């Protein structure tokens, strides 16, 4: 997006391997008894097959956990990603829905569609994963009609949690 972390941190994306993360989780769980985690990665699952390998390693190491992530709707609807996330203990995902207006999403350079927001939300809920939306109101050139589209989307999709920026 043209206003998010990418312009701040640049185009470089650094991520630990699933094996490294599973090792860290095992350590934290063993030494501190933690069973719920917030994964601090605003595009969790960006690298192909990362989520699938993460799920496999958690099961192999017998590490049942519950966790929360932030991700993008276009990443989540790829292949078997949602199924793997649900099977590995995902409790809630925060997505940058931002707006129910395609015009506003395009102005933000989100690279997603309103339809993808709907699809992803339905798929996550089918797997009993809570869905939370980050929304923005007052984006440059946003009209009342754009705001009404966002309100309509929220009423139809009924996210479990909402964070609003104005």
Give the residues covered by each predicted segment.
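Radical SAM [4Fe-4S] cluster-binding motif and immediate context
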Residues: 1-134, 139, 152
